């Protein structure tokens, strides 16, 4: 028994706590013999092999490189690292890669006749291959790795990729993402993610995602957007809440899009299908036994060897969908619609797709999809029923059919009283867990299929209401603008040329421009500036984004210090609670990590760009301020 307890002690702290508390509970509430049974049978025989397999797959990739064997034990501690330890580890990796790059550069210059020989595609491709190859030990795919393997590397590509590999902050972001997924993979292996414990995502993941969002919200409240030219300021939080970053607006846009797709399909005589695709059983860490209310969750031993994560399940579904699309193309078949990705109770993803096609093509499309859905392990029990399901959609019923899945995966809107088929729990309560799952594994939940670009639709909606642009372009472009202006997605599809129209043949596309600035990796910055019509030429651009904005801290109105109150005025002007106050409003000073996380959320709405030098300067200033504040507090104390 002591040997098993010692094994528990070697696990990350969050798992130590989990298993130790469970052992003590069983021992206290049942019997010492029950506690011993838990240790020997449940933990050592069933759970420990799963945990060890996850650690083996997530640990250092010695097959890719043995250049970092000295850091193997430290890397194995990643799930248990705090932020301070992680930053030190990231800095050490970046420093070693920089030293390796310098060493290889000197060797190349000496062998081929001086430092000027380094500035060629051949030289930098060689150096990149060595440095990036070593970095792959940490389970990352360096930028442009596929280009390098194909012999298509250029000096500019090499500089961009290497400049990331030798930067501390880049490694901090990579390691934080890995830490989050590694922890969740261990909790899945431990049986903590299922309908009986915590459906869709672990309690730790749900808590962490919720905490990050609260931190982001505090940051957004503490900042404003400032016009670079006029100095005009607007609330950052109001800008975000008026964009698709707001779950309510995102849901409404999706529902409007789906309703428009269905109306378009009806107008052209197409028929609808509701498709469900799932993964083979080996991707599921658990299985359900029994029926109805007596159904229970058991560990799936077929998962133990592969230890697939939800990300692996998503890759599988993307791979078979790619094969299906190729088969459609080879057989002159076309589909269009919307895809929704959601998790099973144990975190394994599955797809729901609302697809439309010509009536005469539906049978062939279903046969192709079924064939590829059952290609891997199609012989296993239940595969024919579970892996692929296709239902005919009644005219006018598609939007209502898929609305539940959209609300469940965003904000739980209008789901009061409805129960989740997977967990038996209220659907309204599952939205937080599902969004935490998507955030943890970075799985996009919604994707249009075969539709005109959504980017152009959103840019057209930025134009002044009711103002024609026909004189600037032509009637095709004006028809697209008018449709977007009214939120009529059916007319927008028609104006763009219909479903499955190649982008270059669409009436309107997003216009981008390379600015005079470069980012921190010395790369050109490309910004969305407006729209253009491919059939009229790329030089005719209508600008939709006339102003440039930057994030700035709010100006806080600080009340003058008086000595009229009964309490003594503080000796130090520093608020030792770490808060800034303005009148009766208290604003939390955001931490550097909060700044960085919120900036990532703002990239999607087009208000700022992460690679904007102004943004980088703001974040660096915040980092510096946070680093200095403890020292100031100590002095003032």
Regions from the PLM with identified roles:
Residues 1-347, 359-637:
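Right-hand nucleic-acid polymerase module
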Residues 354-358:
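Short hydrophobic/aromatic beta-strand micro-patches
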